[in-house]
């Protein structure tokens, strides 16, 4: 699901809100989440999951085109850990 599909679906389910209002709320929520992670803080949405930063240590990588070794710096990357309710709902899906 893309962001625009999410906005469309929420606007349909919440008839009292316009698509523009839903779009604004989604954009503001995502911006706030990004700002919180930028500040090094953790985000927890009970039943859904938590977002945090994990440190990825420096390592030697490989350029896929040339095959040459490349030194990669250490960096922080976003990490999502699903909550218990979300895990249970996904586990119940029969694919």
From Swiss-Prot:
User: Where does the source fall among the domains of life?
Assistant: Bacteria
Q: Does the keyword rRNA-binding apply?
A: no
Q: Any idea what job this protein has?
A: This protein is one of the two subunits of integration host factor, a specific DNA-binding protein that functions in genetic recombination as well as in transcriptional and translational control.
Record's PANTHER family?
DNA-BINDING PROTEIN HU, INTEGRATION HOST FACTOR SUBUNIT BETA
| Family per record | Belongs to the bacterial histone-like protein family.
One GO biological process from the UniProt record?
DNA recombination
Keywords, comma-separated and alphabetical = DNA recombination, DNA-binding, Transcription, Transcription regulation, Translation regulation
Specify the protein name.
Integration host factor subunit beta
Q: Which NCBIfam families match?
A: hip (TIGR00988), PRK00199.1 (NF001222)
Q: Which organism is it from?
A: Shewanella denitrificans (strain OS217 / ATCC BAA-1090 / DSM 15013)
PROSITE patterns named among the record's database cross-references: HISTONE_LIKE
Q: How does it assemble?
A: Heterodimer of an alpha and a beta chain.
The molecular function terms in GO held by this entry are: DNA binding; structural constituent of chromatin
- Region described as Disordered: spans on this chain: 56-76
- Which Gene Ontology cellular-component terms appear in the entry? chromosome; cytosol
Q: Does the keyword DNA-binding apply?
A: yes
Identify the InterPro entries for this entry: Hist_DNA-bd (IPR000119), Histone-like_DNA-bd_CS (IPR020816), IHF-like_DNA-bd_dom_sf (IPR010992), IHF_beta (IPR005685)
